[in-house]
Amino acid sequence: MTAITITDAAHDYLADLLSKQNTPGIGIRVFITQPGTQYAETCIAYCKPGEEKPEDTALGLKSFTAYIDAFSEAFLDDAVVDYATDRMGGQLTIKAPNAKVPNVNADSPVNERINYYLQTEINPGLASHGGQVSLIDVVDDGIAVLKFGGGCQGCGQADVTLREGIERTLLERIPELKGVRDVTDHTQKENAYY
């Protein structure tokens, strides 16, 4: 079950918007684009009957159904959708404190734990050089496939950073991980730090 909260004020505002769509059974779909990254954006969209996905979690509310995207669900933990009135009318707000970095524990999937450590421990250090690293995949043999960007792409020290910094940190924190692999095209050097 998802831990997203839709306040009464937000519910009433959304119910009013949905009633104006003249589509019986229309609801909303809540999702995050690029979850677990610094570029994460929380979104709410209309969801006509049949547009929901089988893996979505259906949250039955008083006047409509909110469909929570399965892939985004962990990142929507503790999220609050609210509506506040002001002199200009009002504003719908979505606060999702885990959109960029979800809460993780030892039972969380490996990819979520990798993203957590990339965002909280590794990327803040790389940001001082204008760089970042992102998880592309975890292959079956326990290898994290990573890609550098920004000042790290093409940097002469990227392999040292990968082995002595990133790999060491991830292996210490995630015992079932066996190693890391870089798939960055380091021939592109125009933004490289070194």
From Swiss-Prot:
Write out the residues that bind [4Fe-4S] cluster: 152, 155
What highest taxon heads this organism's lineage? Bacteria
UniProt lists the family membership as follows: Belongs to the NfuA family.
Instruction: State the protein's purpose.
Output: Involved in iron-sulfur cluster biogenesis. Binds a 4Fe-4S cluster, can transfer this cluster to apoproteins, and thereby intervenes in the maturation of Fe/S proteins. Could also act as a scaffold/chaperone for damaged Fe/S proteins.
Q: Tell me which species this is from.
A: Pseudomonas fluorescens (strain SBW25)
Keyword list, A-Z: 4Fe-4S, Iron, Iron-sulfur, Metal-binding
Q: Coding gene?
A: nfuA
Enumerate the Pfam families for this protein. Answer: Fe-S_biosyn, NifU
Protein name from the UniProt record: Fe/S biogenesis protein NfuA
Q: Which Gene3D superfamilies match?
A: Fe-S cluster assembly (FSCA), HesB-like domain
Cofactor(s) of this protein? [4Fe-4S] cluster
In terms of InterPro entries, this protein maps to: Fe/S_biogenesis_protein_NfuA, FeS_biogenesis, FSCA_dom_sf, HesB-like_dom_sf, NIF_FeS_clus_asmbl_NifU_C
Q: How is the cofactor bound?
A: Binds 1 [4Fe-4S] cluster per subunit. The cluster is presumably bound at the interface of two monomers.
Q: What's a single GO BP term from this record?
A: protein maturation
State the oligomer form and interacting partners.
Homodimer.
Annotated disulfide bonds: none
| GO molecular function terms attached to this record | 4 iron, 4 sulfur cluster binding; iron ion binding
